[in-house]
């Protein structure tokens, strides 16, 4: 058996028990091959409902390699569409309009429906599969609670909160197209406007207003100040903070390596006393212990000491032999 086929086979065997569990939990979205830790760095293979998504980040795949992948996973499920996204350096931005249209499908995770589409105007899938453990946590803990989902992207966490019976769910994201997918996800699960809300806003303006912190912005000479949605101060029972590695706006800079407190402090202050803040850091080179130390110091300085902390680890379709997954998730009980 060729070495590459052997690696795919081993990955499938390693997932057998997990996939049995996920299928029983009404889940058909998961990672099939996590190349970084399964023998082929830069290659990922995911199932999104009826779609097989293949992505390469280091080098383009040959037709033979693509055919081998398709044949191997045809034994698991009959894909209605196979999508290959070449995200290696020379091809990551080369995508014509025809490619971007793609087909739309519905995938399921833990009984919740999500819009899935392999080719679209952005690069990332609509649903980040390694965050399943976080969405699972929200499904189990959001009932009868007020929930704020920051950097909500396509609102998976917020959808889970509403499905769990949260008494209030608010999703905040700067990108209108992300929230549009979130609204589709809400419709796919028959959620009403009373159950879930969407706010298009910069993180800093929304989080600071909820936290009761004055909003400041950088304004160049001759320019008018940027407008932003006006929100009432409010604290939430459960806040979910999942920021990108780096982003800059007129209201602040997100930098998970050098300045995590800039996003953490307003999130802490928007969480009520006795509430829960779930926060993440997806930068692989930031060690867990260093990040946790920063989180604890920030909480103390903000006057919101952490009474207890627990950690969520991505599930077994994202293996991490050294026990240090890039995605770090901390649940802070305040």
Model-derived features with residue positions:
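Conserved SAM-binding motif I beta-strand of class I
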Residues: 168-173
